[in-house]
């Protein structure tokens, strides 16, 4: 991404240059055209590429945005007001959120968390201040706390389940990814309960991984198939570690998104010991 603001800030503040959305769009369109005009000469000088070949490569101005959140390389979100010549801040809209590489697009982020992250991101890019966003996060955390434990897990896809299961039988105890262990725990508990109705987890299946509190079996997590429509009573009665899952899927995801702002959201949105 590129911003001309650091170069032009002094002129704008001194009133020697107009700075508006239209000015920005025209400026960046002009920059893109100048890059295209100068590129063949650059290719010729740097790589001895014939000018007619260097002229085959054309760059286009993609997005102009008025606000942005830049976390790391290839992880950012902006409020786009123009994408490839199409204005988006029309008919009462402030623009369109364009996000890349963020948790709200990751498959291991629960759908309800994706929607919440998008909500607070939209608020931020619309100019909402810290206090209002903090209050919304706290409100959501109270709502999320009221959900049953199995709705607080993290989505995963289980691969090589058969391989790790056979290795476990052969060695007695085998090292494996945590979500695979959680899937095997579901299958084991299903057999222990004599449950022939619930789905068995097999290779390649999508599951939800839930953390567990200390228990006689020594398990730290258990998974269930996302396609299982009727969770059995034995599963719903397990000692889910709600606080651990809430910290992972709410606090962790919010920090990944907004931590770059240094707002100390962990302390500001703590809902424990409030009374």
Which residues does each PLM region occupy?
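DNA-dependent DNA polymerase catalytic subunits
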Residues: 1-275
């Amino acid at each position: 991404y590129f911003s001309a603001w650091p170069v032009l800030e002094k002129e704008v503040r001194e009133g020697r240059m107009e700075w508006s959305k239209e000015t920005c769009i025209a400026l960046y369109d002009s920059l893109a055209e100048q890059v295209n005009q100068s590129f063949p000469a650059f290719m010729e000088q740097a790589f001895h590429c014939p000018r007619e070949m260097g002229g085959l490569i054309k760059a286009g101005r993609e997005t102009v945005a008025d606000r942005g959140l830049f976390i790391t390389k290839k992880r950012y979100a902006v409020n786009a007001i123009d994408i490839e010549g199409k204005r988006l801040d029309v008919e009462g809209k402030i623009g369109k959120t364009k996000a890349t590489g963020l948790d709200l697009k990751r498959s291991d982020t629960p759908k309800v968390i994706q929607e919440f992250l998008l909500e607070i991101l939209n608020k931020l890019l619309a100019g909402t201040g810290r206090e209002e966003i903090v209050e919304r996060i706290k409100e959501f955390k109270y709502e999320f706390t009221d959900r049953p434990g199995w709705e607080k897990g993290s989505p995963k896809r289980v691969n090589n389940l058969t391989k790790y299961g056979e290795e476990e039988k052969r060695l007695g105890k085998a090292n494996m990814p945590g979500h695979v262990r959680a899937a095997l725990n579901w299958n084991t508990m299903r057999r222990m309960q004599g449950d022939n109705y619930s789905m068995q987890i097999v290779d390649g299946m999508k599951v939800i991984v839930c953390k567990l509190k200390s228990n006689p079996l020594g398990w730290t997590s258990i998974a269930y198939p996302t396609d299982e429509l009727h969770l059995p009573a034995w599963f719903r009665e397990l000692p889910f570690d709600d606080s651990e899952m809430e910290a992972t899927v709410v606090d962790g995801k919010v920090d990944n998104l907004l931590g770059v702002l240094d707002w100390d959201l962990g302390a500001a949105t703590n809902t424990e010991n409030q009374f």
